Amino acid sequence: LCLITNINKFFTVPSNDLEMNLVKSKNIYLEKEYEKLLDFKNNIDIPYDYIITNTIVNSYGFDKILINGNDYDINDEVVNENGLVGLISKVSGKHSEVTPIYDTKILVKINDIEGKILRKDDNNNLIVGNLSNYDDINVNDKVYSNKDSYIGKVVSVSKRDVITEVVVETTTIQKNCYVAVIRRNA
């Protein structure tokens, strides 16, 4: 009987220790998530109301991003610490769908010159065209949405015949856990 008791003690972990280890592991995980959230909040500078949320799925179906929450309006801008990444395109039960910026065809501003997002290139850079005065656009100029959210910077300007296209380096949210949804109408 003593031998069986000793074997049981050796091969089993008392439930209190197991529970304590689970609580410690969960606490460590939550502390790391809290630090990530604080880092994100401290690295964004948005002069409007915004809601911080996290991505659930970064690329399901047709290049859409799924985020938590449904207290958003269609076309609310979604940003990470590096700039605009997309627009709210669908709001449902507990989640919302974000269309990546390269699929939005929105108007953008480069030095007060309007253009339109046409597509993305193989490196996920934006191609901006329909520019009215491309002579005033240079590499490293900043690009903003028509609502003044930073998008990225110009990395090249291509002029051929009457068509001018600008390549804009942008950010993605594939590696980012948190995003902010800007609420200008709230």
What annotation goes with each model-predicted range?
Residues 1-186:
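Extracytoplasmic/periplasmic terminal helices and flexible tails
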